[in-house]
């Protein structure tokens, strides 16, 4: 093994095709190719789309962390018929929502894929592939449409576990009588009024939903028929499908019903981001094992927001006023907490003075390594923000005020009323004001000489304490997400 070929730790993935956890063996040592089905771009993306993006972004980050050279491809299906209902040119509509999707992905701190192909840019390759499928006897043209013959694919249904005689074609839509088998699917559709179309040997038309491109990923709902059809047509055009591992993330549900636009039971990424920091949404989307369903929950989003806040040191941006050096009460309290932590460390070290110098140095190195390890884990999880702490905390406070339906002036007024009650020893009123704010997700913290507030999970019933310590949050995140996506050994 050369110096450049560093041995990678084993990576174990659950393969939908075999329904087993398998040790990943790349086709080319040190290199991994991932293809993930992207969105059909005709509207703002919902949090179900976000879960797929975050799940595979986590895999992408982890593989790079392990030292693999990763080629990550996520497509845009920009060929659709929704534009005719919007009075907008089809490609203009899709281009607009491709860009909106990329803004959402940036907010969620999803890394840009290596390539982001659009269907409309690859019509020539698609036509050549269809011609190859027909040439191999696996496809047939009828009246400008081209269908794939599932009878020519002996393994059809293997990925999803669907038997060919149980695919229930026609259950949701009428069966096209021109098909040789009701389960046959369209490789290309003849042009219709108001829809985008391209010239081909079979006339003007557009590709069906199943012409796309190691690892193939997507949402669980794509297993059948989308991915099943991909396998069938790719095998028909090429000797080898080129996919060894199939990964599928679970649905996001609303009241335990799959979230989707057809049921109008969804929330867009933008809607959630209007009330919560996008990284709180990312944290929420990673809060369950990636193949399991994830039920939408305001309380869970609140908990994720609280965790994100607790991970951020309590630092405020310096004032722009020249010569102003006075520290805020919150900053002073944070310094006090840091000093207490340092005092604890100093006491601990003083007890170890009798140790040999080498042992003491080992302790210091260990502390540095712990901090480094935590940062590495948070980076792999995509939770290290590029914002300054001041910018992050300011944004999270503003969104907490939005959720509470309050302005900061109103919160400060309540704090002043509470301070007056405390001075007059009306502790019942003081506690009541604090509790009422806590019910709205505004947590008051008394620090020397002042009272400050921070976002928190809304209080649902009286209790003695609120929030989690930063240390507890860090370790909870580390141990929760180490088993989120992968198993390495």
From Swiss-Prot:
Major site of localization recorded for this protein: cytoplasm
Keyword ATP-binding among record annotations: yes
Superkingdom, natural source: Eukaryota
Keyword Glycoprotein found: no
Catalytic activity: tRNA(Cys) + L-cysteine + ATP = L-cysteinyl-tRNA(Cys) + AMP + diphosphate
Enzyme class: ligase
Coiled coil regions, renumbered to chain: none
Motif window: 'HIGH' region: 39-49
Record GO biological process: cysteinyl-tRNA aminoacylation
Positions of Zn(2+) binding: 37, 226, 230
MF (Gene Ontology): ATP binding; cysteine-tRNA ligase activity; metal ion binding
GO terms under cellular component: cytosol
Assigned keywords, A-Z: Aminoacyl-tRNA synthetase, ATP-binding, Cytoplasm, Ligase, Metal-binding, Nucleotide-binding, Protein biosynthesis, Zinc
Cofactor-binding details, from the entry: Binds 1 zinc ion per subunit.
Binding sites annotated in the UniProt record for ATP: 261
Matches recorded under SUPFAM superfamilies: Anticodon-binding domain of a subclass of class I aminoacyl-tRNA synthetases (SSF47323), Nucleotidylyl transferase (SSF52374)
Required co-factors: Zn(2+)
EC number: 6.1.1.16
NCBIfam families, per the entry: cysS
Name under which the protein is recorded: Cysteine--tRNA ligase 1, cytoplasmic
Protein source organism: Arabidopsis thaliana
Biological classification of the source: Eukaryota, Viridiplantae, Streptophyta, Embryophyta, Tracheophyta
């Amino acid at each position: 093994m050369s110096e450049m070929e560093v041995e990678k730790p084993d990576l174990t993935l659950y393969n939908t095709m075999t329904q087993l956890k398998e040790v990943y063996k790349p086709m080319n040592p040190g290199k991994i190719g991932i293809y993930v089905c992207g969105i059909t771009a005709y509207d703002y993306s919902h949090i179900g789309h976000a879960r797929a993006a975050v799940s595979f972004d986590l895999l992408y980050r982890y593989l790079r962390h392990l030292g693999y050279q990763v080629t990550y491809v996520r497509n845009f299906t920009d060929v659709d018929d929704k534009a005719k209902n919007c009075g907008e040119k089809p490609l203009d509509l899709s281009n607009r929502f491709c860009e909106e999707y990329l803004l959402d992905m940036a907010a969620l701190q999803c890394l840009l894929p290596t390539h982001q192909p659009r269907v409309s840019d690859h019509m020539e390759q698609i036509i050549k592939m269809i011609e190859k499928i027909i040439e191999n006897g696996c496809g047939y043209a009828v009246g400008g449409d081209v269908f794939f013959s599932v009878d020519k694919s002996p393994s059809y249904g293997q990925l999803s576990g669907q038997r060919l005689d149980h695919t229930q074609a026609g259950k949701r839509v009428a069966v096209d009588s021109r098909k040789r088998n009701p389960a046959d699917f369209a490789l290309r559709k003849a042009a219709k009024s108001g829809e985008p179309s391209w010239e081909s040997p079979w006339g003007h038309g557009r590709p069906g939903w199943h012409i796309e491109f190691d690892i193939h990923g997507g949402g669980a709902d794509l297993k059948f028929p989308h991915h099943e059809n991909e396998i069938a047509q790719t095998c028909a055009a090429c000797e080898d499908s080129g996919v060894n591992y199939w990964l599928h993330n679970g649905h996001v549900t609303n009241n335990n019903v799959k979230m989707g636009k057809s049921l109008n039971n969804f929330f867009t990424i933008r809607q959630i981001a209007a009330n919560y920091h996008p990284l709180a949404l990312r944290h929420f989307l990673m809060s369950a094992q990636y193949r399991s369903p994830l039920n939408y929950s305001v309380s869970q989003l609140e908990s994720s927001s609280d965790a994100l806040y607790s991970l951020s040191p309590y630092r405020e941006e310096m004032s722009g006023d020249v010569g102003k050096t006075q520290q805020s009460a919150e900053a002073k309290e944070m310094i006090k907490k840091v000093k207490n932590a340092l005092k604890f460390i100093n006491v601990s070290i003083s007890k170890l003075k009798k140790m040999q110098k080498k042992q003491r140095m080992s302790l210091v190195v260990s502390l540095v390594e712990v901090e480094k390890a935590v940062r590495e884990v948070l980076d792999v999880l995509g939770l290290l923000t590029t914002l300054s702490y001041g910018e992050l905390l300011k944004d999270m406070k503003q969104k907490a005020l939005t959720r509470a339906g309050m302005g900061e002036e109103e919160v400060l007024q309540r704090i002043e009323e509470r301070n007056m009650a405390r001075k007059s020893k009306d502790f019942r009123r003081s506690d009541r004001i604090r509790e009422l704010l806590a019910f709205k997700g505004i947590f008051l913290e008394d620090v020397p000489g002042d009272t400050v507030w921070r976002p928190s999970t809304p209080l649902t019933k009286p209790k003695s304490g609120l929030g989690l310590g930063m240390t507890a949050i860090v370790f909870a995140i580390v141990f929760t997400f180490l088993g989120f996506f992968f198993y390495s050994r």
